[in-house]
Amino acid sequence: MKGMELVSKVSTKKPYFFGNPKSKLKVAAIDLGIKNSILKNLANQDIFVKVFPYNTSFSEIEKWEPNGYFLSNGPGDPEPLVLDQELAKKIIEKNYPLFGICLGHQIIALANGIPTFKMFNGHRGINNPVINHETGKGEITSQNHGFAVDRKVLESDPNIIITHSHLNDNTVAGLKMKSKNCFSVQYHPEAAPGPNDCLLYTSDAADEEDSVDLGGR
């Protein structure tokens, strides 16, 4: 699995839309292997989604004038996905709202110079416990990944906060940038099927995007 780029095998070949075009918010989703339940979750938050292939250029996505950007879940090693790392860097540089889950979470870390590593035992299943450091509460999450973000390097970065940790092995389960509209989680916060007590990412993103000065976008 180390060094294997699998996203090109599962990503959509052409853009498509999901949700209500009259929704108050538009989100550009970068398809790294996106699940339909994630799209349904976004649509349920009154978000209109345009799903782009993983290798779409930033300029092409920006033309759609989304309110925010989303890096999806997906398979394989995040390190070979250089185009998506560069895409995340450009979004962050412009301070557009950006959030990611699973593989997208790892891409955001790599875009900030935080390395990832192959885990000895990956996290698989619907009952992975994490602690939310911002609320102090535990959450049961659905996870399916074999790579993780390097915690030691992340802890040394003054610009990023660890928001969630896995309770079994203390791996990073969530992060947030201090001065940018960017955050991510390592798990699948989906509405159905499975656990639904971790839907924070869509509601938080919607609130954040709605309150950010988007320059008329």
Language-model features, listed with the residues they occupy:
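Hydrophobic alpha-helical segments, chiefly the membrane-spanning helices
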Residues: D213-R217
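Flexible gly/pro-rich beta->alpha loop and the following alpha-helix that scaffold active-site loops
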Residues: K35-G100, N112
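Internal, non-catalytic "lid/hinge" segments that mediate substrate recognition, gating
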Residues: M1-K26, N36-K40
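Pocket-forming structural segment of enzyme catalytic cores
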Residues: Q85-F99, H105-L199
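Conserved small/polar residues in nucleotide/adenosyl-binding loops
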Residues: Y201-E208
